[in-house]
Structure formats: structure tokens, C-alpha cells
């Protein structure tokens, strides 16, 4: 990045403009003026403004991304997953969630980070249901999906399920959020259908469920 080190510039009077795009579409801007003199080094701070009562746009997520949607009757809180592959449909995230905000959790099966994430989300299920937006749980593979047992958790009723059969969703998230090697599952984000990401987490962090609730209440 140009701002990480020194840069040679012509002598003169300069204006440095920076901006932080917020979830509401507004931009918090900062303007700094400085002079470059011959033979002298000028240090200028790059200021990225923030607001505690607003969410920043921190990345992008393509809401037209396709995944394999799993019919509701495949997952029951009282029984293991039952395959009915002929009823599965490739859909976009937008088709599933409708316009507005949504959450996506790209997960594997049986790992400690994913299990902890599911337990955290289960603990705040009622509050996430009050938010009323779709939470799309996408399994990283068919194998991960087949092993999942919904009855092991108390996930919100607003959860929908799917499979990232070709890994394209994971690759897209990793590219947009600048993650190495596909990131650490689970990858959890809150975004809108204008493709703006306002919350992101990879792996497991303590208080994940509460963080999702706080984010939902700020939208």
C-alpha cells in the first residue's frame, strides 16, 4: 500500500481526503492539508473516522452468489438429515433472503469452532428471531451437511440451509475479505443485498452470538 511507507512527491500544497463508508450509506470524511518542501520529509497522519453508534462497511459479499438450497423437509429438529436430492434447487442468496440485511454462516461439521458458534447462536435464538431476517447456514461440503443433526442445537427458526458444493462461496468470501487459504471456518457475516458487509468473523470468538444481536439491533 502507498500509505505504509514513504513516497516521493513533487513540492507543493496537498489535500489528503479519506472516508469511511457506513451501513446507512453515509460517508464519514476527513480532510487534511499539508505542504511538501524540497529536501524535507513531511509526516501526515491518515485518519479513518468512525462512529460508535454506526456500523462501518468492512467488505463486500455478492448476494447473487449461487448455492445448493436444501428443502425444509430435509432438516427436522426431531430427526437426522434425510436426503431428498431431487428436490434441491440451486438458488442465489438474494432469492432466499429477499431484499435487505441477512446473515450467512459458512460452516463445516464437528469442529470445535463451528460447534461453539452454533451454541452461541442457539443461546440468542429468540433475539435473532425478533430481528426477522434470514440466517443462511451453508455447509462447506455435502459430507459436512450429511453429518449435521439439527436437533443437537436450538438454532433460530429464521435459519435456512444449503451447501457450497463447488467451494465458490468460500472462495468469494475469502477474496472479498482478504483471507488467506480460504479463511478459518466458520465464516460468519452480516450483509445486505447492496453487497455491503457490516459484520464479519472467521473461526470462533467468544461472544459471537451477542455480537450478532448487537449488530442486528444497530441496523
Model regions and ranges:
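Structured interaction patches on ligand/partner-binding surfaces of diverse proteins
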Residues: 20-51
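Solvent-exposed, conformationally flexible loop/turn segments
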Residues: 38-41, 68-75
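Short Pro-Gly-centered beta-turn/loop motif in secreted/extracellular proteins
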Residues: 2-15, 20-22
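A short beta-strand-turn-helix
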Residues: 75-102, 110, 119-123
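Structural micro-motif
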Residues: 156-160, 175-189
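Thiol-/selenol-based redox modules, centered on thioredoxin-like
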Residues: 47-69, 184-219
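Structural microenvironment flanking redox-active thiols in thiol-disulfide oxidoreductases
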Residues: 102, 106, 110-157, 168-173
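Exposed aromatic-hydrophobic patches
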Residues: 2-8, 43-46, 163
Amino acid at each position: 500500500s502507498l500509505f505504509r511507507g514513504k513516497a516521493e512527491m513533487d513540492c507543493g500544497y496537498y489535500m489528503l481526503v479519506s472516508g469511511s463508508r457506513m451501513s446507512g450509506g453515509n460517508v464519514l470524511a476527513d480532510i487534511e492539508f499539508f505542504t511538501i518542501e524540497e529536501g524535507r520529509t513531511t509526516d501526515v497522519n491518515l485518519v479513518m473516522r468512525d462512529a460508535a453508534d454506526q456500523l462501518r462497511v468492512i467488505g463486500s459479499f455478492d448476494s447473487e452468489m449461487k448455492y445448493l438450497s436444501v428443502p425444509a423437509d430435509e432438516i427436522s429438529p426431531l430427526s437426522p438429515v434425510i436426503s431428498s436430492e431431487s428436490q434441491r434447487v440451486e438458488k442465489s442468496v438474494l432469492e432466499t433472503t429477499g431484499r435487505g440485511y441477512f446473515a450467512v454462516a459458512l460452516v463445516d461439521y464437528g469442529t470445535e469452532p463451528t460447534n461453539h458458534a452454533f451454541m452461541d447462536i442457539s443461546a440468542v435464538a429468540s433475539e435473532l428471531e425478533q430481528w426477522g431476517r434470514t440466517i443462511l447456514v451453508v455447509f462447506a461440503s455435502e459430507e459436512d451437511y450429511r453429518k449435521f443433526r439439527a436437533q443437537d442445537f436450538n438454532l433460530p427458526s429464521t435459519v435456512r440451509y444449503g451447501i457450497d458444493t463447488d467451494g465458490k462461496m468460500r472462495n468469494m468470501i475469502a477474496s472479498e475479505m482478504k483471507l488467506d487459504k480460504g479463511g478459518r471456518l466458520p465464516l460468519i457475516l452480516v450483509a445486505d443485498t447492496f453487497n455491503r458487509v457490516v459484520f464479519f468473523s472467521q473461526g470462533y470468538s467468544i461472544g459471537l452470538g451477542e455480537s450478532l444481536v448487537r449488530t442486528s439491533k444497530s441496523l
